[in-house]
Amino acid sequence: QAVIDGANEAGGFCFLAHPFERGSRVGPDLDPIEWESWDVEGYAGLEIWNYMSEFKGLLRGKLWALFYAHYPGMGIRGPYHATLEKWDELLAQGKRVAAVGGADAHGKTYSMGPLSRQVFPYTHLFRCVNTHLLTEKPLNGNRGHDKALIYDALREGRTWVGYDGAAPTKGFRFRARSVANEA
């Protein structure tokens, strides 16, 4: 709570990252790092999908690790249901909780015997789970102007999460209508 309060007091904001995570017995650095303090307040949002958290959960053994290190798309399925259920629960309580998704990119190289592989290169990870922002005005290249628009969009929850691993989501549009043509 102190970190969230400090960030807010300094004009920043916080997101709860990888709230639910499965670890892997393949290595100690693959233990789950889940969010536990659900009684905190004042955070801006929740990371509803973390690519590397999902990848880590696929690694049930060394053979699985070798396979998914080369073919991650064969196992990546989407946000954990527990995360989406928690987000729904928080929203049902009347809390404003923005959604973000992330790559959790570290570009670390892992070795297993004579084999080594970077899991995963930044160029791969930044084409996977991405947070898209809906800004009130177009970005114009001015750092101060653009920073304010980006921070406002994040803080206010004008975001959506796309999986660019399947197909590019840039420019994607969606609409919702009710019987009365309201959304």
Label every model-predicted segment.
Residues 93-99, 103-183:
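C-terminal functional module detector
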Residues 2-121, 137:
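Domain-core and long-helix interface of multi-subunit machines
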